[in-house]
Every structure is written in C-alpha cells, then in structure tokens.
C-alpha cells in the first residue's frame, strides 16, 4: 500500500541469512498491516500503523533484543537511505548495510558530491565470480570513507496538525561507501550497487558487498512467499493469521535452502521432490523453488497421512507391521535422510 486509499495489506518480513553462505536460516519476524492495525510476531497486541521505515526501525530494535547469540547486520534496500534512520540505528550501536541513492549528496575528500559521482571516480578490482540473472559475472569492489551531512526529512506527520514534519538539521555521520560493480567477460557493466555501511573497517569490502548480493538474491524468496499462500484476504480467518504466516514462511525457507544447496545428494533430493510436484523443468536449469515448494507440500501431506494409518496385527497374532506400515516406515526413513541433506 502506498497511500491511505489503497486496498489491501502490507507484509514486512525479516529473514535471517547465513553471512558466509547466503543460505536462509529462518524467518525472524513477520509484521502484517491491514485495516485493523499492525500485527507482529514480535509483540502480542495490535498497534497503530507506521511508516515503512518507522516500522522497520521498531522491528530491528526488537530483533536485537532477542539476543540470538550472533552479531546482526541489518541489510536494507534504498528506502533506508535516510540520514534520520541511519543516525537512529547508529546511536543504538546497531550495524547496518544500506543501498544508497546515487543522487544523494555526501562529502568526499572535503568536497560535496553526489554518491554516484563518487562511485564513478573510484578504481575497481574484480574480486569474485557470481551468478547474475542466470549467467556468470565478475564482481568488482571499491570502497571509500564518506560523510553524510544533509538535513533529515523523515516521512512522519505531526500528531497535532496532521502535516508532514519539517526538515530537521542532521548530525554528520561518517560511513563507509562500498561500490559493487558487475561486469561480463567482455568488461561491459551489467549493474552497480552503491552501498553505505557503519560496519567496522576490519572487514573487507568484498565481504560486505557479498552480503548485499545475498540480499539481492533473497528477492526470489519473497517472490516465492507471494505465490505460496500469503493471500491473506482469501484465508477467511482472523485467529491464526500470524501463525500461518510463519508456517508458510518456514516452508518457503526450506524450499529456498534446498534449491541452493550444493552436492550430489542435494541434487538427487531436488530431482525427486520436483518429480512429486508434477511440474516440468528445463533440462539445463536447476529445479525452481515453486516446484520444490509444491513437491514438499505433497511429500509432507503424504507422510502425515501415512503416519496416521492405524497399526494392525496379522491373523497369526504377530505384531509386526502390515505392508502399509512398512511403507510408512520407509517413507519416514527416507524423509529423515532427506533432512540430513540440508
């Protein structure tokens, strides 16, 4: 929803991803905003709707309070390029990586320049090879320190007047500019990300750019969510909305993780799960996440059905399982083996 007259709902998801491999771990939070207010898995009651960045900042603070035992780096797209929110997160000691808007101005070497102009003047070195839209691309990295001094223009309304809050003088904020550039074998530029971060300098720019590459690939996870039962208005229920959101999200995480897992055993598991879905796949392409999700749904429902089949004894009085039960045991052993692949 982009304005008050829109019809629908908004879903904001926080997904925990392994920084080393880029594989999903679990959905940490779901925040659903509809006509009744804001529902979140991070709190029990319903709250008033907030702007996108206010809601995100609130969720980030609550996620940090979970104390999961690891240092969190919050990766945010271009909407997060706001000095007000960068400063708010930084003063709390929270770490973030945000894609900057190239038209915004920063101070670099004592001069005020657009972020894109600073990126144009940097020298790049290819550090790694990554997948980009189904083909290989070189990932070149360059970085530099910049200072953000522009005024803050938060998208908030004054509670008394209802008008948008006026621009506020901002505090200067020194951050690291990391520019990631993708190019093909002939040197043609395929894409560029200008990233701003307050993560300490002891980490190399390649590692920080890789994090955003993981975030960019996560888009496929959210596309899977949109096509996997998150049509809330069709559920015809009100009591278990958030529980269903988390179940669907976890199923999407499992399918997404399996689709990206390497190794011969994982490849066989993907082929088998895809065959269960009944969907056709191109020979040269890896099995798609929608087909894997459909196959997993069939597998789990089948296992559930077979596991509930009553145990019976044969006429001779033996308590050994009948063939159907042996089939169940075979399926369960196969499922346990499949889980170990992940």
Over which residues does each language-model region extend?
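Single, function-defining residue in the core of a domain
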Residues: 3-10, 17-342
